[in-house]
Amino acid sequence: MSSSSATKRKKLHIALFPWLAFGHIIPFLEVAKHIARKGHKVSFISTPRNIQRLPKIPETLTPLINLVQIPLPHVENLPENAEATMDVPHDVIPYLKIAHDGLEQGISEFLQAQSPDWIIHDFAPHWLPPIATKLGISNAHFSIFNASSMCFFGSTSPNRVSRYAPRKKLEQFTSPPEWIPFPSKIYHRPFEAKRLMDGTLTPNASGVTDRFRLESTIQGCQVYFIRSCREIEGEWLDLLEDLHEKPIVLPTGLLPPSLPRSDEDGGKDSNWSKIAVWLDKQEKGKVVYAAFGSELNLSQEVFNELALGLELSGLPFFWVLRKPSHGSGDGDSVKLPDGFEDRVKGRGLVWTTWAPQLKILSHESVGGFLTHCGWSSIIESLQYGCPLIMLPFMYDQGLIARFWDNKIGAEVPRDEETGWFTRNELANSLKLIVVDEEGKQYRDGANEYSKLFRDKELHDRYMDECVEYLETHAHHEV
């Protein structure tokens, strides 16, 4: 690029609209901050409660990031004040999608009035690309998922889809699909495939499938951004470009988050002070950190095995057990086994409010992460070389676990049909990863990968390339 063309390039106005889940909202916010650091104006669109719950934006960027609140329409069966997936049980999420689709008019009016150069959107607003096209606004799809998982879900291109029969049988999801041309162990266990088919491939209360949403938003975009990097998923990124017949699939890098300063944590630093006191008393590299995201609702039976497995391991543990804000469903009614807290007193800490995950993972006493395998959690853990004890439950979590299994951690053994695991299997997995000699390979692997995951310069270069694409391909550029 010549210096004269760079000089002529105008500052852009870029809007971002993530799906109503904080596992999506936070990576979108990281992208927004990087765009703002390049001097471009950003409009970050969500609903009022979600905007209020965002982490504090650095003061240097607040003049460039406008937080746009569009009220979520009232929908029957959706609790009042429920504006994100963490606010509702899993079976109510389709009603959140109905409300999300009700944002179409507000989004359309915003785009018409503000005429941004780009809108970067998620998988959910299937109606958005045609609106942007009609208004002459460029649009980009940003996938917060990793490339290997997205390849497993297949092509969204009409030309490619016609070459393969649609997957309708369970066994088609429990082996690597035919369009993956290289050896792969990424596939679903039967219990995961059942949940996937129920939740993704059949129309829900919103009237459309998640598959339709994904196809519409990818096929309607000019560029496909994805939270990945070539150092980890090079062949998968090439395959993704081929599958979707998109000339441009750009990795954003991993967007590794930085440890927040005390003035950026929304007044929650007192939580960390208490946690740090406890962690400081523990032996280096021996604490199990256990957390399963904000959406998981566990049955009492599964909950018991988790608790008793942690106890049986004999290891010190810090377990984040967040009560769901919706006040209903399995996750709200589960109770710790009788006498559990007394038996683990001093060795195990059960934490029931917000916890600063990144700070915990960065603490030297933490030696293993018992995780549901959300992509953001994997990235945060491997930044600090923390090996994984993997216990996936839904969505793409099983695919991510297969990708990393035997590299930087191991999955807890389970019944493949039901997903059941026992306290003994969990305890053995915890000890393997954190203290056993046989687990040293996983600890070493996680430590080696940490160099790549925390390489801020590398990941910033990926985002720089994405921003450069936005700068040179906006419809409104003069």
Swiss-Prot record:
Localization (cell): Membrane
Record key words, sorted: Glycoprotein, Glycosyltransferase, Membrane, Transferase, Transmembrane, Transmembrane helix
Intrachain S-S bonds: none
Keyword S-adenosyl-L-methionine: no
Signal peptide (from-to): none
UniProt cross-references to InterPro entries, sorted A to Z: UDP-glycosyltransf_plant, UDP_glucos_trans, UDP_glycos_trans_CS
Transmembrane segments: 12-32
Topology term for the membrane: Single-pass membrane protein
Pfam families named among the record's database cross-references: UDPGT
GO MF terms held by the record: UDP-glucosyltransferase activity
Enzyme class label: transferase
GO CC terms in record: membrane
Positions glycosylated per UniProt: N146, N204, N271, N297
Main location: membrane
EC number: 2.4.1.-
Family, as annotated: Belongs to the UDP-glycosyltransferase family.
PANTHER family named among the record's database cross-references: GLYCOSYLTRANSFERASE (PTHR48049), UDP-GLYCOSYLTRANSFERASE 91B1 (PTHR48049:SF60)
Official protein name in the record: Putative UDP-rhamnose:rhamnosyltransferase 1
Species whose genome carries this gene: Fragaria ananassa
Lineage: Eukaryota, Viridiplantae, Streptophyta, Embryophyta, Tracheophyta
Name of encoding gene: GT4
